[in-house]
Amino acid sequence: MLTQFEHSVKEVENFNADCFRELKALSKPPQAVKTVLTGLVTLFKCKPIYMKVEVKSEIDYWDMAKHLMADPRKLKEDMLQFDKDNVSQAALAKIKDIIIENTDCTEERVKNSSSKCLTILQWIKSVYSYCIIKGNNKVSEKHEEKVKIEEPKDHPIEKI
């Protein structure tokens, strides 16, 4: 019997690299697609690309995802060879926030937005589950501790 991770790897093996090209070609991807690809970018530790939004800058995960999908065959191979044993606690905490606990990022919604993105979502979830089961299960504790450190109640956060 295949584990969840092994099953998702089989799905990635069957994933047509042209699907990455199709996703990359979207000029205005649905939010569910953006969310899943933000998770992919997070796992692959892509260098941030910033875009200006009014007066502040934000990380543009969509541009980062397009850059990651520039070579579809390489991305597919990278997903198949992904070092799931060395995913950082910060990456797992972010995946938990944007994918695992996000009620707008269900398999049904992602499939309705882009069936091609569903395999990527399932792969991300299986990497996360593998990490939690294999001992990186202190994600929630570390994440809560990080939030407490970053946002102390007696020190207001400056908003730009």
Each model region followed by its residue ranges:
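Extended alpha-helical scaffold/assembly modules in large eukaryotic proteins
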Residues: 2-160
